[in-house]
UniProtKB/Swiss-Prot annotation:
This is DNA repair protein RecO. Involved in DNA repair and RecF pathway recombination. Residues 250-273 are annotated as: Disordered. Belongs to the RecO family. Residues 257-273 have a biased composition (Basic and acidic residues). NCBIfam families: reco. Pfam families: RecO_C (PF02565), RecO_N (PF11967). Keywords: DNA damage, DNA recombination, DNA repair. One of its GO terms (biological process) is double-strand break repair. The gene is recO. InterPro entries: ARFGAP/RecO, DNA_rep/recomb_RecO_N, NA-bd_OB-fold, RecO, RecO_C. One of its GO terms (cellular component) is bacterial nucleoid.
Amino acid sequence: MGVYHADALVIRSREYGESDRLLTLFSREYGKIQAVAKGVRKPKSRQRAGAQLFTYAEYLLHKGKSLDTVNQVSPRESFPHLWTDLDMSMAATAMAELLDLATLPGQPHPELFTLTFSSLFLVESCDPALVQCTYALKLMNYLGYRPRLVECAECGQRVQGERLLFSPDAGGVVCRQCQTQGSSPAVGRWVSGGSLGLMRQLLQGELEKLNRLRWNQWSKKEILEASQYFCEQTLDKSLRSWSMGNRLVNVGQNPSGKDDLNERRDVDGTGES
């Protein structure tokens, strides 16, 4: 395969050399592609639009030994709303980063392409953070990392309670009894029962019905942190854009009236504080 066509999204774009950009593309047919767009940083470059983050375009690519080369590009969608709203932009950046870290070049994932493409549109009509969390849970589920959110990941009993331990190492939520059993107690984050219920809906529900869901500021912060923690621990990689976005979430009061910054902390399974 010398020259080939690919309809792809730009999920990462960074400077490369004096006037080039190194693009990470994600296509339905080929999965992730690393390609150099030569000369696109020059003001008069005709291919400049095709090297912008989140652009969806038809690319004519030349296959190289380590990096492909963009020969021609025909932009189809630029998602302009992502550049006019900070929350939308940060959610899209977080999703693109997760997709990049969770996949390898040359492995097609048509379902993930559809999920990503749809989610970039959806942030305009739904809470961007809600779309971001849904995207993370569905992506991880597709890759085989479905968290157990109904039954205890350790004993299989249905979980109940106002505060539950969410442990990626265990594979999901852990009941009170299993939290302290054994020589190595489960490690994770405490999640409220309400947030856990919403996480179930995000994982199992349809994207088209996402705008029907509502969450408060406390649930937003809690689920964003739990989603990031789950992805990072499972993939063993750091999500930098997620950390930045979480810091910008406006912290309110949790349902008990206590400041949620004082309530949220890592735990070792021996207690909530």
